[in-house]
Amino acid sequence: MENREDLNSILPYLPLVIRSSSLYWPPRVVEALKAMSEGPSHSQVDSGEVLRQAIFDMRRSLSFSTLEPSASNGYAFLFDELIDEKESKRWFDEIIPALASLLLQFPSLLEVHFQNADNIVSGIKTGLRLLNSQQAGIVFLSQELIGALLACSFFCLFPDDNRGAKHLPVINFDHLFASLYISYSQSQESKIRCIMHYFERFCSCVPIGIVSFERKITAAPDADFWSKSDVSLCAFKVHSFGLIEDQPDNALEVDFANKYLGGGSLSRGCVQEEIRFMINPELIAGMLFLPRMDDNEAIEIVGAERFSCYTGYASSFRFAGEYIDKKAMDPFKRRRTRIVAIDALCTPKMRHFKDICLLREINKALCGFLNCSKAWEHQNIFMDEGDNEIQLVRNGRDSGLLRTETTASHRTPLNDVEMNREKPANNLIRDFYVEGVDNEDHEDDGVATGNWGCGVFGGDPELKATIQWLAASQTRRPFISYYTFGVEALRNLDQVTKWILSHKWTVGDLWNMMLEYSAQRLYKQTSVGFFSWLLPSLATTNKAIQPP
């Protein structure tokens, strides 16, 4: 165990110690967890106030810094004042002991994870590790192990002093509870209720599936690549109502992400990304080991189970009870839910119309939407002697789209049969785990998305819709399902996309038109929205949304 590179990379961010090839909790933490596992008659943990003290004592045993008083007070506020006495008693009689028992198993769950990590896919690293920026790779975690990780977060048992230096998001729940105490809101309480419901479901029946977390990287194409693209535009489905997570098409679902995965999920945030992390809490596990995304990176998560229903958005968000996820499993026991996190530029204002910003956004979407099965279908694979990369080339030239490290030996070009024996690693892993199985299951997946980078991020909805359409088309996605959420600026989206498709425009055609429009906006030569500029015959002219 001590010689495992993956374990050594993540161990500084875990509350465990390693001795004689085994993982352990410190003795005093074991004592506290054992007492809690036997119920309040042994541990005396029968209120939020006592739970707060138990968390304080365990963190002190781990030599961690003291939590802010507001965080500790948040636990007491929730369990002693907000929820009713019957629910509170159930938590201290049943859920807290079950979570403590789960944490006692945490070291052995991790050991089993690392024992199995090298056998999931031949030649591919899948063990829990820090996936640093510009380090493409994938991690497979069992839902049971994820439950233990989130239990650590609930009890604030992850070391947090060293996370900032690695640009890692927060992972403990202290800020979540502090926000509840400092400035109570029903939406914040509902976020916590989603997580409570997850733990209640987990403790009643431990799930047996797998969730994968992948950092994807592309070498970003330049503007000339996009201008000259002759790829046809994919189909475009407009939905004025409905939610991305309810899409029926088995499409890739877009998380309008912060560059720090999860954004404000574990603090006060309550918009699209944060809501998704509350109703699919297993997504939070990625915040442990995935540092912030660079401009050429995306994070794809496959298999996260949904546990909660909800209503509302932002301040009106409310927990609405149980959700039973009926998604089928793939050959790796992952639910067929694929979520990709891509972060847009924040408050771009007029910068949004500059070529460099448009290029940044389209390449970010390209990385997120890349469907490896389609990429391989149209490419040949070469391995260069003496370097550590697989390169995708098309028509004998480097496409500039993808590069990634591999653990396979360097050799001459691989044919399709050889490719099944020597699997490509990291960001080209997806869809190539099992020859003819995962490929076929996902080769026709579209993209389900919406107003990415708009709202609080300040992006232009018409340009952002166009950018995502271009990226989806370039990556050979068969369609986009676009959820407008009733945004007025997109009322003509269906009409415009149908007109463009009827004229058989290519990716390059639409990209060049968008560049021309953006230049006119920058130089104040037009004040109308992109769609009205493109189609002056629209019944009602869209006045351009003025950047704040």
Swiss-Prot record:
Stored Pfam families: PARG_cat_C, PARG_cat_N
Keywords, alphabetical: Biological rhythms, Hydrolase
InterPro entries tied to this protein: PARG_cat_C (IPR046372), PARG_helical (IPR048362), Poly_GlycHdrlase (IPR007724)
Catalytic activity: [(1''->2')-ADP-alpha-D-ribose](n) + H2O = [(1''->2')-ADP-alpha-D-ribose](n-1) + ADP-D-ribose
EC number in record: 3.2.1.143
Annotated GO biological process: carbohydrate metabolic process; defense response to fungus; DNA damage response; regulation of DNA repair; response to osmotic stress; response to oxidative stress; response to water deprivation; rhythmic process
Gene Ontology molecular function: poly(ADP-ribose) glycohydrolase activity
Name of the top EC class for this enzyme: hydrolase
Signal peptide: none
Family: Belongs to the poly(ADP-ribose) glycohydrolase family.
Job of this protein: Poly(ADP-ribose) synthesized after DNA damage is only present transiently and is rapidly degraded by poly(ADP-ribose) glycohydrolase. Involved in establishing period length of the circadian oscillator. May regulate post-translational poly(ADP-ribosyl)ation of an oscillator component.
Protein's UniProt name: Poly(ADP-ribose) glycohydrolase 1
Organism: Arabidopsis thaliana
